[in-house]
């Protein structure tokens, strides 16, 4: 597959297939009458945003010092191309693998297996999908106030290779960053990158990023689209080319970028697979159950979100899961929308992930738990099920994880 460079025959033309309107199948209980969206399950209870809630949150907030660098993830140089020292056979194996690089917080660059050969001497690679990219220093409406990075991205945004799709889970500032998205869009040839987001976000991409109508797709839960590189051949579609299947899947969260737009847009997780092989699930930002005060150590019997088991039934198994493990304390306030590591393990099992990487930690201090706590709790939770660190663990910034997958 050639690099995503616009030429007469390799631009993204008509590449997103499917009806223009969100599909009508499935339960639409998450659609709020009159507009907006809700979490439709007993597993979600809103703690509220009134003065009493804010006061209780303030009283329970414990400030921890930023850990020294040697206790946080190390920095690695990403492997976006096979090392020159590899033998021809080893290079073939590298191209055949699914590859995921953690770029901090919830940002991953995933490269699916490459085809057996590239036409015309073009770069040989698989589809590249970038999830929730944020390079800004603050995750805030302003770069003068709001949470500052504790750790920097492992590469500059200029070192990011060309990507075919950018997939967004929801519109919170630590997942949807206007400066980053503008840079990506402007750095690549026109029409060479497609943006996917949940319902209600298309207008923002059109106005804030300046994308054309055909360069962004918004989807409802369980809607899916197919992405192809290259224009359709004369007389019909080129069914021989590589294809990327993008499925918008549910999760339990909320949205808003200001004071008056709470839940006006949808939140989502994503299941994405390539016709060349490999399937991943990106959890975005999600809760699993609401934990009342005093029940932090007594989770049995609490309602859990049924969406993840449904994802596993409909879309599993997944070769890789990218699952949030941080920003969870205090539980009475954040449990309905942010997984603690004990919840993350349940997602790994229910979504049916062969391997998972923990994310949504060690980048910004968004909640009061000590920053190095999430991977420790994750390891303890995994051990309860006999899940080893090679199956579900954390990785270093910039580390490229290779996963063997079944070629198609």
Q: Can you say where each PLM-predicted feature lies in the sequence?
A:
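Divalent metal-coordination and catalytic microenvironments
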Residues: 110, 132, 170, 177, ...
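Catalytic core of the metallo-beta-lactamase
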Residues: 111, 119-122, 228-316, 335-342
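Active-site metal-binding loops of divalent metal-dependent hydrolases
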Residues: 133-135, 171, 200, 251-252, ...
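Metallo-beta-lactamase
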Residues: 1-159, 163-174, 189, 197-284, 319, 379-406, ...
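Cap/insert and terminal regions of metallo-dependent hydrolase folds
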Residues: 1-32, 38-44, 151-160, 164-165, ...
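Acidic/His-rich segments in extracytoplasmic proteins that coordinate ligands and/or metal ions
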Residues: 174-178, 182-183
């Amino acid at each position: 597959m050639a690099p995503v460079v616009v030429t007469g025959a390799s631009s993204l033309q008509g590449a997103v297939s499917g009806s223009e309107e969100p599909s009508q199948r499935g339960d639409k209980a998450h659609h709020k009458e009159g507009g907006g969206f809700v979490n439709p399950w007993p597993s979600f209870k809103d703690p509220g945003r009134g003065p009493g809630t804010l006061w209780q949150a303030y009283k329970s907030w414990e400030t921890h010092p930023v850990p020294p660098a040697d206790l946080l993830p190390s920095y690695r140089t990403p492997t976006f191309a096979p090392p020159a020292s590899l033998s021809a056979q080893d290079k073939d194996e590298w191209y055949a693998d699914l590859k995921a690089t953690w770029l901090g917080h919830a940002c991953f660059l995933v490269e699916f297996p490459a085809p057996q050969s590239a036409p015309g001497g073009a770069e040989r690679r698989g589809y590249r999908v970038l999830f929730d990219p944020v390079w800004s220093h603050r995750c805030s409406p302003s770069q003068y106030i709001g949470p500052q990075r504790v750790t920097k991205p492992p590469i500059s945004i200029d070192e990011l290779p060309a990507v075919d799709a950018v997939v967004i889970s929801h519109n919170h500032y630590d997942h949807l960053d206007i400066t980053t998205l503008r840079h990506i869009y402007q750095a690549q040839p026109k029409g060479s990158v497609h943006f996917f987001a949940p319902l209600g976000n298309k207008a923002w991409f059109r106005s804030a990023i300046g994308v054309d109508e055909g360069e962004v797709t918004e989807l409802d839960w369980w809607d899916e689209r197919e992405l192809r590189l290259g224009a359709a051949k004369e007389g019909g579609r080129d069914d021989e080319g590589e294809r990327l299947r993008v499925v918008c899947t549910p999760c339990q969260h909320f949205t808003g970028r200001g004071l008056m737009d709470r839940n006006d847009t949808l939140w989502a997780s994503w299941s994405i697979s390539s016709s060349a092989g490999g399937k991943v699930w990106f959890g975005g930002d999600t809760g699993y159950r609401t934990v009342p005060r005093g029940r932090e150590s007594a989770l049995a019997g609490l309602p859990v979100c049924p969406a993840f088991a449904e994802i596993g039934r409909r879309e599993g198994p997944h070769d890789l899961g990218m699952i949030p493990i941080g920003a969870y304390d205090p539980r009475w306030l954040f449990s309905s929308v942010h997984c603690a590591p004990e919840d993350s393990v349940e997602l790994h099992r229910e979504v049916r992930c062969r391997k998972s990487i923990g994310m949504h930690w060690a980048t910004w201090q968004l909640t009061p738990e000590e920053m190095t706590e999430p991977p420790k709790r994750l390891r303890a939770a995994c051990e309860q099920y006999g899940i080893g660190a090679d199956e579900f663990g954390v990785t270093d910034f910039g580390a490229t994880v290779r996963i063997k997958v079944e070629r198609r």
